[in-house]
């Protein structure tokens, strides 16, 4: 025990006053900041978990609640003055001994900034409104329903139900049954999205998850509704990050504000136009991330515990951002489609009323994966390889769905070059006419498209055979320009590789009937092996 600690102990022992809360002597007259910090830390250790102060990336946070549940807030020195009074009786050394007092913001700042206080309070990484599943070393799982010092997670909410695996798979499929996914691979990725927060929050899967980009062909297709369903499974209302074109608050600032709340789910809503955020790209790959907090020290955050979704009908991504994303394409249901109904109302209300069961369904799949040894696929067609190989194995071998990345390459490329849709339609007609593998000129590609009733660029809706020479040249020129843009945006060494086919471009010398020769560009559609 230091001399200062002995001095403080002797003062407290000589005091005959009985205090309802543990006594804490503020610095001054022989009491140093370290002594006060130690006394306060002990007071917080004896308090209820949600009343404690926590160390999050060497910044002090407190747990608060709103209508959406628990969250973290950076503790300001002004607020610390009253927070200290909730767990202790604040004292100072007066002329006649110990006297009750209040803490000034300046004194509070010295305490919460001291390494002694920061190292004495518990660490926290995440606050959730539902239990969190963790992995044991013996390929079993445990579920956290309160504060867990090892993981730094404070979980609240109702415990998850134990759900048999077969029932769990049926529940998750039923949850998605009203969505009109563009392809079977999109459903696999939607199932992966439902599982990912459970896998990464407690680091059962210690890997970075990509941003889940929900693309819709039309308004009201269900992309935003999907984020609400996923949030309901975890008893969370995802923190929303808005993309603003003017005024205060950039998307980077809004992301930092959402991250500091400590809630695991974040939604970037209704992206439009070009998304170019180096800060967000850094967050998706950095091992640690420093989130800026107004009027406080930055908080160091572990990005691997967070799950970000984004919704859009039409947006452009940089190649780096596209590589950090996983795309789920949703089509709008026909007007006459009949959606599921439940005693509680729609599927969202049903999940909220039965949240412990749906979370139990997610946990059942996670437990089965852990029981089987956390196996992964030997290869991955995504830059986030660890996440992709694990979720690909789960959706194939436990959920019995198609491979995770089916159709993903095209969805990814579409955000960089919307002409990819035109190229896929051209491939469909070239293949149907038996011209695959043949070297075709722009005019021959136009003939294939015209036979399939595909509108030709530059033709203004007129069929190819009805165009005059100038119109035909215009169509061929437009097709050539479209191919050039595709190769410029997506090509590597005059090749574009998609899931179903590759497009190869080559220049050849052509001899015409007149005897003249010239260089011409040919395009070959090569089916995938």
Which positions does each model-derived feature cover?
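Post-Walker A helix-loop "phosphate-sensing" segment adjacent to the P-loop in P-loop NTPases
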Residues: 232-243, 287, 490-492
